[in-house]
Amino acid sequence: MKVLGRMFKDVNRQDMKIEVETQDKARYMGLLLLADEQESMIARYLTRGDLFVMRADDGRVVCVAVVTDEGGGVCELKNLAVAPCFQRRGYGKYMVGYLCRLYACRFGTMMVGTGDSVTTVSFYRSCGFGYSHSVAGFFTDNYDHIIVEDGKVLTDMLYFRKSLC
């Protein structure tokens, strides 16, 4: 793993760091499945994407993210998952900000696709993303099971975009 940067301290005063995992990406599948419930869907982008791992100094994995190059000056945040014990403490938002700064030198736009749930839509809006478009029936057409978020069955993929320049 290559260390890319040091970060802030969390409420427990533990130092955090973000690294790029280039070898055994599949070992993070358990955490990646928190954000994308089907392993075969994750496999479609994990091998071609950059996998970022945020760790506490004691080695615990706090957060993971996968970013892909979609061509035409666009990258996509394909997966963002925060370990349950670290959720709702700002780590996901920090990771998104970090990735936006990191990729700003290579891409003009970052996209993210998500389901139509209040929690995730408001999260990405708070990170500076604005609505772009939707893909009707994405979840029902591509997943082998029903996906429910915030008590709502997901059908369409909503895409949000953020200018990085």
Language-model regions, residue ranges each:
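Short amphipathic alpha-helix that is part of the acyltransferase structural core
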Residues: 4-41
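Active-site rim helix/loop that mediates acceptor-substrate recognition in acyltransferases
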Residues: 26-57, 61-64
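Conserved beta-strand in the GNAT
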Residues: 53, 60-69, 73-81
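A short, internal acetyl-CoA/4′-phosphopantetheine-binding micro-motif in the GNAT/acyltransferase core
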Residues: 80-87, 115
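Conserved acetyl-CoA pyrophosphate-binding loop and the N-cap/start of the following alpha-helix
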Residues: 86, 90-98
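Conserved GNAT acetyl-CoA-binding A-motif
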Residues: 103-116
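Conserved catalytic-core motifs of GNAT/GCN5-like acyltransferases
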Residues: 111-113, 125, 130-151
